[in-house]
From Swiss-Prot:
Keywords: Disulfide bond, Hormone, Secreted, Signal. This is Prolactin. GO terms for biological process: positive regulation of cell population proliferation; positive regulation of receptor signaling pathway via JAK-STAT; response to nutrient levels. Disulfide bonds join C70-C184, C201-C209. Belongs to the somatotropin/prolactin family.
Amino acid sequence: MAQRFKGSNLFLTALLCLASQGHAVGLGDMLERASQLSDKLHSLSTSLTNDLDTHFPPMGKILMPRPSMCHTASLQTPHDKDQALRVPESELLSLARALLLSWNDPLLLLTSEAPTLSHPQNGVIYSKTRELQDQSNSLSSGLDRLIHKIGSSSKSLSPLPFQGGDLGSDKNSRLINFYFLLSCFRRDSHKIDNFLKLLRCRAAKQDRC
């Protein structure tokens, strides 16, 4: 998996270098690359969730906060594909970027907490949270390039603030809150992935997106 992610970053770096050197990089190519990165981001968050599931307290999911408690829950996003199809490209891209940037601090918290997590696979979990950070940063750079290419949305969207400074004092609370935060990220990464794939389809002018 690490080799695949490394290859993705190298490909994106090549595209960004071409763009910075004045070489024309097509919108379709940029959206294709961004879609591949967002897909890997969501796949990695799913893999992390599966790792946590192997040793998760039986009452953990009952005690876990509801999805409405995610710090990004207040950001208004399309509920389904039909709604998303009616959103202008620049606004949909701005939504994806706002969602992604809202996770800068939470991903940093997850990475710092992972090594001491009360879980037998905390080493693997730590490695994957670092991968999440790297992938998120790569995708963020790609989205900045796309916004420059497509144009800014008339509805300027800012990242949502994250108020959580720690995951709790006891080991079970920390594990449950870690899982909850990751589940929120997994949900948002799925939205980002769907938005970018829809933009890729629309840019290709396909009849059915």
